[in-house]
Amino acid sequence: MDRELERLDQEITLELQKIDGNLSHCFDVITKQVIPRVVAYGQVCDAISDSCEWLGTLCKSSGVVDLKRDVLLERTPVRDSDAHGNAHGDTHGNAHGDAHGEANAERSYGDVAGGEEHNSTVQSEVSDSTMGKYREDDTREQGEDDSVQRQKKRKVSLLIQERYGSSSSVMPSPDKRVPQQSLGSSPVKEQVPLPGTVIHFSTK
């Protein structure tokens, strides 16, 4: 009976030693492997949380802040100093530029006026020469028409003379009609020859 108890006691002791060894091993694993990894993971999570919080703050701030106004406020001192420096330069430059611009404007106005006067003179000369040419052409055409009409009339008169005799034989002159010796005689005794027949043709 005692031997059985001793044997059981030894077996229990061995089992407890094994359990203690396993617990020690588990403790070592947890202490040396798990806990450092958990700590590292916690640090990473903290960094992620901080980053997310910073991003959230940045988004909120960017939604509220007026960037243009801030930039203008930052650049205002520089612009004020530049404006004071440019005011004197602009005043002097504008005065000189205005005087130069007025001189250029007067010169341009004179050039334009001279150009318009020259153009009007040239146009008047061209119009006068053109009108003179048209008048010469009209005069020439009118002279040609008159010469053609005269030629037609001359041809008609020549045809009449050829057909009915000369104009002197058609109508005798007053000298041939009344002889000089019969001027003092009675008109009853003297017989005046009858005039010849005269035919008139239109020469239109």
UniProtKB/Swiss-Prot annotation:
The gene is ASK1. Component of the DASH complex that connects microtubules with kinetochores and couples microtubule depolymerisation to chromosome movement; it is involved in retrieving kinetochores to the spindle poles before their re-orientation on the spindle in early mitosis and allows microtubule depolymerization to pull chromosomes apart and resist detachment during anaphase. Component of the DASH complex consisting of ASK1, DAD1, DAD2, DAD3, DAD4, DAM1, DUO1, HSK3, SPC19 and SPC34, with a stoichiometry of one copy of each subunit per complex. Multiple DASH complexes oligomerize to form a ring that encircles spindle microtubules and organizes the rod-like NDC80 complexes of the outer kinetochore. DASH complex oligomerization strengthens microtubule attachments. On cytoplasmic microtubules, DASH complexes appear to form patches instead of rings. One of its GO terms (biological process) is positive regulation of microtubule polymerization. It is found in: Nucleus; Cytoplasm, Cytoskeleton, Spindle; Chromosome, Centromere, Kinetochore. One of its GO terms (molecular function) is microtubule plus-end binding. Residues 78-204 are annotated as: Disordered. This is DASH complex subunit ASK1. It comes from the Eukaryota.
